[in-house]
Regions:
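Cell wall/extracellular polymer interaction/catalysis modules
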Residues: 29, 34-229, 237-278
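Bacterial N-terminal signal peptides that target proteins for export
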Residues: 1-12
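C-terminal motif of bacterial Sec signal peptides marking the signal peptidase cleavage site
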Residues: 19-21
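Bacterial signal peptide processing site
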Residues: 23-25
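A conserved hydrophobic position in a structured secondary element of the catalytic/binding core
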Residues: 234
């Protein structure tokens, strides 16, 4: 049976890795705001108040739509107020910047491209963080965790019935993973590559709509500033701090936005004030 990408519980394990590939197919033209692609997320996945039930926020802001670096900040809710936890931490983003993704938010009208498969952009918006994953048998978090095996793949082929899902080739057959560029054990498929040793799943494109982007993660980086294919990458220490803090009982969500969009939406979405250290 395939494991739904948005609800699979992933393993958080070994240190020192970074997830980089979130989509790796050739880029396609960006969809315009208001297009059918922009409206593809189901009603249950969007809303005017996308952080209403969240008790923890992982906020990533970037200088603009084409920025490839950003800052990660953590917040906890106390009643109607948000309180910052810790200090801002550097992260790397998609090689082409950001684009509106499909998540908990209603698709805003205004500037910004729409996320497409292979565009090299990290999805912007508000997204659930369903769980963690990694190479080791145990995690470093209260978050649901699943250890990945050599036969586990995230399918980024948008013509596949398993698009945007984690599947086990031993169960679904080798043909089911043909053409995918996302083995979840990169170390076993790419000469010891440890980038996926520790990470978090980002619930982007919950309806698994073909072409709107797949296999989005938060993960470790190999070196500061190294861009991704659409994920958010960070240092080992930042990931471990994040994982040790996250609590599934508090409904953690990721908010990823350019600074101007964050400022525009802050009041309407009840977002906390962020610190800009640049």
């Amino acid at each position: 049976m395939p494991r739904l990408f948005l609800h699979t519980l992933f393993p958080v394990a070994a240190l020192g890795l970074l997830l980089t590939a979130c989509t790796a197919q050739p880029p396609r033209p960006a969809a315009a705001a208001g297009s059918p692609e922009a409206a593809a997320a189901p009603a249950s996945a969007v809303g005017r108040y996308p952080v209403a039930n969240a008790g923890q926020l992982v906020v990533v802001t970037a200088s603009g739509w084409d920025a490839t670096e950003g800052e990660l900040q953590r917040f906890e809710r106390d009643g109607m107020s948000w309180h910052r936890i810790g200090v801002p931490e550097a992260v790397s983003l998609g090689r082409s910047g950001l684009a509106w993704g499909q998540g908990r938010h209603a698709m805003p009208q205004g500037d910004g491209p729409i996320k497409r498969e292979g565009d090299g952009r990290s999805p912007a918006g508000v997204f659930d963080l369903p769980g963690a994953f990694g190479y080791g048998p145990t995690g470093h978090s209260l978050m649901p965790y699943e250890a990945m095996d050599a036969s586990d793949w995230c399918i980024d082929v948008d013509t596949s019935p398993f698009y945007n899902r984690i599947i086990d080739a031993r169960q679904e057959g080798e043909a089911a993973v043909a053409g995918s560029s996302e083995p979840m054990r990169l170390d076993l498929h790419n000469a010891g590559d440890d980038r996926y040793a520790l990470g978090l799943k980002v619930a982007h494109n919950p309806a698994n709509v073909p072409g709107l982007g797949s296999c989005i993660f938060m993960h470790l980086w190999r070196r500061p500033g190294e861009t991704t294919a659409g994920c958010t990458a960070m240092s080992d220490s930042t990931m471990l701090t994040l994982l040790s803090w996250l609590d599934p009982q508090r409904h953690p969500v990721l908010v990823l936005l350019p600074e101007a969009e964050y400022a525009r939406l802050r009041s309407a979405w009840n977002l906390p004030a962020v610190q800009v250290s640049r």
